[in-house]
């Protein structure tokens, strides 16, 4: 197996940890063989139950018990939905699914110090897995990142540095520092997507070894989109599913570069208005794997929708009243599902999975303000 340059086709051996090609372009992993049903390790209750499909020797696994998150049947706008509770991961977000595989690979290749840029969740996840692996860790975060996320990162022993400006400014600062410390970016290092592909394997197993009709996810850089596609593609190639699901990405309208490009019919970013959004976890202006994410969604038969701030707040409150306390970024997907059902793009007789990616515990102060929550005074 090798790294593969998606444009030139040049390959690089996996024996050397890389986050980009020699020309600075991102790299993918060559197609993997995947697994068949009989190869699942049913004794393992983490993503490593699918170790036979992962391109990392299990002997090097750094695990905190991530994965195998609940799939809960519910209702949304009059139709059935399956809530995938990724926010129940060890550090409170889906990022653990990719981080366990990426950190395991990096440690197996002798990497001792790692750098990441993050709005919060990826940083918290890398800090935790780096601590578990015994790696030194530096995390760059935007100065607007919520304090609970910063505290979670720092508690793991990481060196946390705030950067002025946008989420993109933070990414560029990390690139500038990548010459002195290994850039373990979940948006660049393809072993992260090797981990997020286990979302597809879990859904397949939890649904009785079938694929859903639709998967709806918040869309920032696109690691859930790419991971789900990689996993379902492996299952389809191995004859374990008859068809692959449609994948729908949802963005905040205030910061929707993918949605704008999708609507324009291009495979590159086009000029779009950018404004602040409460969905800070997906507020990226220049994602890395643009053509790839757009291709995956189009090929699946899905689409990308953008929702406004009021829709996000409404979905946030509705989810909370169903017992699903998620951060605003997760609520973006639910707001998008409302639009997709109303437009008929998703039908109520289809099996639809709504992926809830991050815990509300990371943003309680913000959620309290958005939903105008306050205790009632007891005047007795």
Report the location of each language-model feature.
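PLP-dependent amino-acid enzyme catalytic core
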Residues: 1-380
